[in-house]
A protein has these predicted regions:
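ATP-binding Walker
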Residues: 16
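Extreme N-terminal, non-catalytic leader segments
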Residues: 1-9
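ATP-dependent small-molecule kinase phosphotransfer cores
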Residues: 43-143
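ATP-dependent NMP and nucleoside kinases share a basic, alpha-helical "lid"
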Residues: 101-104, 121-189
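Walker A/P-loop
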Residues: 19
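Post-Walker A helix-loop "phosphate-sensing" segment adjacent to the P-loop in P-loop NTPases
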Residues: 27-38
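P-loop (Walker A) phosphate-binding loop of NTP-binding proteins
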Residues: 13
Length: 217
């Protein structure tokens, strides 16, 4: 068993098995009694929404059935106007899926705070958690980023690697689950790029990611 922990990144489209692979890495770390930190580039978006909805941060089980259903189901949002009509004083509502709320919030705040706002948020959160560990735990700790969706997120994990002195391994996920989906949202383009290169489920794409970031791919 290698004592020094690593940094793992997972890339794949919707429903490609990223959560399953992250869970497998968690189980493996637990079997080796190795500490683990989960880095989630969507966590800052979720906490922003939870603060808007409830007034405080709320821990969400992202592997649970409730969260999966919330992303798929639509909610009614009351508006002080009627969409697509010039009637500003009429109350109306719009239906929005949980996944759409996450995507729209993430993209809009990027326009305000920079394209890498969530990458910076997550890298800081992970590095701060790692820095609070004992020297032994920090050395052995694995860090898992369950979903890389943008160049800036990949750049962020290499920055975390510099701060922690850990090796990076990035794997491609392409398991075709019942929820497997190819769509044109900007957050899916990163994974689709590697799909277009012919990458298969389980491939180590670390060097391909580096080449993409260096502009060589």
């Amino acid at each position: 068993m290698s004592l020094k922990g690593k940094i793992y990144g997972l890339v794949g489209v919707i429903g490609s098995g990223k959560s399953y692979q992250a869970e497998a890495l968690m189980v493996g770390a637990a079997c080796e009694e190795r500490p683990m930190i989960m880095g989630d580039f969507s966590e800052g978006i979720r906490q922003t929404l939870m603060n808007i909805f409830t007034g405080e941060s709320k821990k969400i089980d992202c592997t649970g059935e409730a969260y999966a259903k919330w992303k798929q189901l639509s909610s009614d949002i009351l508006l002080p106007f009627k969409p697509q009509e010039e009637s500003p004083n009429i109350l109306d509502s719009v239906r929005v899926e949980g996944r759409e709320l996450l995507q729209r919030t993430g993209e809009y705040l990027k326009s305000l705070a920079g394209e890498d706002v969530w990458a910076r948020w997550t890298a800081n959160a992970v590095t701060n958690s790692w820095a609070k560990m004992s020297e032994e735990d920090a050395f052995m700790c694995d860090i898992v980023f369950g979903s890389l969706r943008f160049d800036c997120e990949a750049e962020a994990i290499f920055k975390v690697a510099e701060a922690t002195g850990k090796e990076v391994q990035i794997y491609f996920c392409d398991y075709h689950s019942d929820s497997y989906e190819l769509n044109d949202h900007v957050s899916e383009k990163f994974a689709q790029y590697f799909l277009s290169l012919g990458c298969k489920d389980g491939d180590d794409i670390t060097e391909l990611v580096k080449q993409k970031l260096d502009g060589k791919a």
